[in-house]
Structures are given as C-alpha cells and as structure tokens.
Amino acid sequence: NPYIKVRYGFAGSFKNADEGKQLALNQNINGSDIIYTLAGDAGSGVIAASNEAKFLIIGSGSDQHFSEVNRVLTNTRKLYNVIVFQTVKDTLQGRFPSGKVIYDLKNGGVELSLLNKNVPEYISNRLEQIRDDIMNGWIRVGVEIPEWAKRQNQR
C-alpha cells in the first residue's frame, strides 16, 4: 500500500521501558498511528506511551488486551505449543529439523489474537481475507530490513 509508511526503531534493550516509551512517542510525533511493539519491558514502555499520546498498538508475545483494552488492536502470538509439538513429532519420526526452521502463519507457528471489540467489522473481515490469501499463497510475506536497521543491530 503506497499510503502506508513503515518506520523501524530499536530500543537497544528488552529491559528498558523508558527507552521503549520514548521511541514510541517519537514515532507517534513523526506520524505513526499504530505501533507494533516487541521486546518485553521496552514493549511495556510502548503501552505506557500509547496511553499518554492516544495512539493504537499491536502487541506481541502475550495477549496484551488485558493491559490496555482500548489501545490494543490485536496481538501477534508465537504458538510455542505447535512448534514444540511438531519438533518432538518430527524427531520421534526420525526427521529432526536441524538448521534454520521457520514457523509462520501458514504452518501454524503464529497467529493474531482476537481483535479489539472496537475494530470495525469490515476491517476484521479484510484481515481474515488477507490471512486466507497468505495461507493460499496469493500474498507472499517477507522481511526486508533497511540498511540502517541492519547497522543498528550490529552495535
């Protein structure tokens, strides 16, 4: 979508809630309407910033609807139960998946939690269609990390 601008930012630590909050506030000041948060306590700082500046967030890991119901649209969840079960099953069948193994939407490794009740039905329906299109291979999901972000991770 040419009208969507994606911004990246790194707090530098999973444990720094203040840095996560400041990063989120800066992204919001620069035009971010929705912020996808990762990183433990740094993510808690993003939640605090969303209360202060009134922007929306997508949480990750655990279901963060319980922390700030009106600010959290949804959460991405890693389904460790699926990953562990599949790894044990493959190992018992003599097919231990050594090396790089990616679990994604298509193979049941991740999902979105239930959407916030304030998300309009047409958006919920569109997200379901996008999910189906990913599952059927019509939409290809990839990760392209900008050069500056690669350099940031090397510090």
Kindly give the residue locations of the regions a language model identified.
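A residue-level marker of the well-folded mature domains of exported/periplasmic proteins
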Residues: 1-155
